[in-house]
């Protein structure tokens, strides 16, 4: 019975935030904080109950816990939620970043406190819904539902210095991209249901039953493309990434934390959970294309990041590069690479969130995000530059941080399958170090390039320090002791890989 509450708590909490705004500015913030804390506590409780440290995957049932309630029985649509190791990790990450998102917007947001927190909570509720839903219709419902609050978040509380027009443009761009891709996925879902109905005479949107749908190769390929396009826009895969830098550079800090940390992960999760098991043969045929697109994404993201002057746009492009690695891993079909992808997703969520929070704090102090205006900040502030250094080296995959474990496992697992692609993408890591260090150099070292950067600036408050140090500790823990994560996702990843590999062995020459 815990599962529906994981989704309901953020929705109810968001509604309360919106209604209690009249009692004072502080009330919505505290309600939001308590709400996200509860969600995080619930997800951790589920993790402790799951008994994931037993590594043999044979005896464990597929879902740790399920919730099934008929919704539109005539078409076989039900409110069907289930959780396994993979979705559990994602939900825990969502809860954690939710708490941080509330904390980092504590001082930043002045107008419409209640409505802001309503949108923030509803995004998080929608994301948790995406991770838990295994009814395809419900999945699509949550997938589209994340959009609207995110649109408001960017359009109403966007970047202060820019005039209203640009942030509304960015929000609209984000909305149109994701909406159009969602429609493609809706068509694919409906087509899949029709194919299943023609084969069996049963209307169902249930993921477990749709897994066994018999279909011809051409149909399967088309449906797989429908799903892939929807996930590729969210992930973002390179030709479809146009919304990401704009959305990030205009969104408030909390919005950026959610976008980078969680919304991008829904796409990778969708590919792993739905694309591969539902259309294994088509995915196997498509795999080389998918992997080359990932390689292209790594290099493109790195080069574009190097060229940016706006520090938030730079970080946005780093996440394009990071998700390129995940894309390569997803299409290798190797268990090791899948495990690496899960760790990479979590580590990237933490490190990108850290960078965006630091950006927000930097902006609150010097009121610019243009790196041409910074420089020489290292001696002007306590703590902040050094912590930026940590997150920058974490992003480029420094051993001892979680990002290294993820990237290493991805490259190691892919090497057995596609050595050429792996060797090429390893060079992407070199470019990663180039843009991270360039960012640090432009912002914190050298001469002060403007008036603002030359005076003494306030250090970090306790709240700011707490958020960042929490992320630092988690990243280092993940880097030195990733075993709990690996154990948790082991059986879920094993199932997905089983579906994928069995079909590959039968189709590939």
Residue ranges and their predicted role:
Residues 238, 352-355, 422-456:
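Predominantly late transmembrane helices and immediately cytosolic-facing juxtamembrane segments
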């Amino acid at each position: 019975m815990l599962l529906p509450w994981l989704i309901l708590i953020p929705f109810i909490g968001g509604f309360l935030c919106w209604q209690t705004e009249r009692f004072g500015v502080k009330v919505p913030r505290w309600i939001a904080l308590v709400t996200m804390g509860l969600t995080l506590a619930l997800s951790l409780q589920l993790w402790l109950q799951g008994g994931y440290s037993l590594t043999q995957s044979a005896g464990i049932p597929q879902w740790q816990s399920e919730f099934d309630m008929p919704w539109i029985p005539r078409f076989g649509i039900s409110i069907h939620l289930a959780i396994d190791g993979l979705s559990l990790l994602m939900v825990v990450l969502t809860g954690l970043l939710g708490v941080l998102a509330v904390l980092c917007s504590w001082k930043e947001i002045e107008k419409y406190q209640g409505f802001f927190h309503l949108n923030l909570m509803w995004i998080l509720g929608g994301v948790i819904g995406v991770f838990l839903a295994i009814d395809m219709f419900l999945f699509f419902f949550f997938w589209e539902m994340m959009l609207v609050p995110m649109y408001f978040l960017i359009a109403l509380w966007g970047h202060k210095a820019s005039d209203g027009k640009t942030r509304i443009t960015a929000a609209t761009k984000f909305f149109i991209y994701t909406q159009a891709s969602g429609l493609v996925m809706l068509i694919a879902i409906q087509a899949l249901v029709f194919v299943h109905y023609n084969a069996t005479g049963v209307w169902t949107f249930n993921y477990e039953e749709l897994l066994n749908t018999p279909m011809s190769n051409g149909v399967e390929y088309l449906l797989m493309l429908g799903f892939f396009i929807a996930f590729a826009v969210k992930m973002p895969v390179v030709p479809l990434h146009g919304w990401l830098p704009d959305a990030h550079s205009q969104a408030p800090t909390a919005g950026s934390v959610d976008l980078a940390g969680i919304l991008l992960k829904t796409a990778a999760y969708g590919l792993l959970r739905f694309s591969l098991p539902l259309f294994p043969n088509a995915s196997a045929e498509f795999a080389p294309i998918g992997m080359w697109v990932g390689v292209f994404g790594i290099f493109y993201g790195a080069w574009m990041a190097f060229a940016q002057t706006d520090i938030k746009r730079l970080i946005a492009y780093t996440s394009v590069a990071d998700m390129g690695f995940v894309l390569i891993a997803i299409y290798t079909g190797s268990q090791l690479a899948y495990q690496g992808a899960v760790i990479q997703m979590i580590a990237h969520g933490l490190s990108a969130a850290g960078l965006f929070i630091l950006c927000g704090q930097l902006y609150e102090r010097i009121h610019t995000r243009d790196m041409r205006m910074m420089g020489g900040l290292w001696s002007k502030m306590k703590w902040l530059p050094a912590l930026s250094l940590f997150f920058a080296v974490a992003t480029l995959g420094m051993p001892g941080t979680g990002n290294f474990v993820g990237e290493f496992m991805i490259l190691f697992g892919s090497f057995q399958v596609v050595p050429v692609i792996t060797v090429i993408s390893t060079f992407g890591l070199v470019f990663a170090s180039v843009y991270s260090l360039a960012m640090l150099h432009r912002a914190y070292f050298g001469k002060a390039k403007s008036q603002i950067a030359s005076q003494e600036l306030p250090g970090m408050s306790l709240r700011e320090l707490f958020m960042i140090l929490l992320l630092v500790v988690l990243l280092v823990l993940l880097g030195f002791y990733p075993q709990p994560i690996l154990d948790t996702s082991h059986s879920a990843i094993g199932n997905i890989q089983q579906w994928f590999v069995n079909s590959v062995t039968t189709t590939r020459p």
